Amino acid sequence: MKKLMFLMFALVMGFSASAQTLPDVKVENQEGKVVSIREVVDGTPMIISFWSTTCKPCIMELNAINNNLPDWLEEVDMKVVAVSVDDARTVSRARAMTQGQGWDDYTCLYDKNQDLKRAMNVSLTPHTFIVDGSGNIVYSHSGYTPGSEEELFEKIKALK
């Protein structure tokens, strides 16, 4: 009976995760303008990565994606959105880091109040989502292991 209940729970959770869309939550962009996360949806699939300046695996993941991004962009039209969850006291460090790391091809957003983090049920960083061109969340993953960025790219390619 417990196995059956677990299976039913897993199926329900699987179906609900596939039907989720990006919430209508406001964040700041690189210029300090307040925008909705939905405004980044433009028909192209994207990787959304939640990170912070104190999270070494976050920075490793974003750098690994950045190293591969030129090759990936030759194969598929996609984008990367880096969402800093640094608070108002440390967001200036996050802004400086996004520029210093050379993440020029990223859309960098700042979730100072962690409203988007809460709305997307992010508890740990790094937390990465794959979102299709319509704003539907199709994949979610916590943590980073070197090489796992290739799995993200495979999932992006599968959306085309």
Q: Model-flagged regions — what are they?
A:
Residues G43-M46, W51-T54, L124:
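Short pre-active-site segment immediately N-terminal to redox-active cysteine/selenocysteine motifs
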Residues I47-I48, V80, T128:
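Hydrophobic beta-strand anchors of alpha/beta hydrolase catalytic cores
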Residues I130-K160:
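Thiol-/selenol-based redox modules, centered on thioredoxin-like
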Residues A19-Q20, K33:
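Boundary of Sec targeting at the N-terminus
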Residues L4-F15:
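Sec-dependent N-terminal signal peptides
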Residues M97-V131:
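Short, internal strand/loop/helix patches
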Residues I59-Q101, N113-R118:
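Structural microenvironment flanking redox-active thiols in thiol-disulfide oxidoreductases
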Residues V25-P45:
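A short beta-strand-turn-helix
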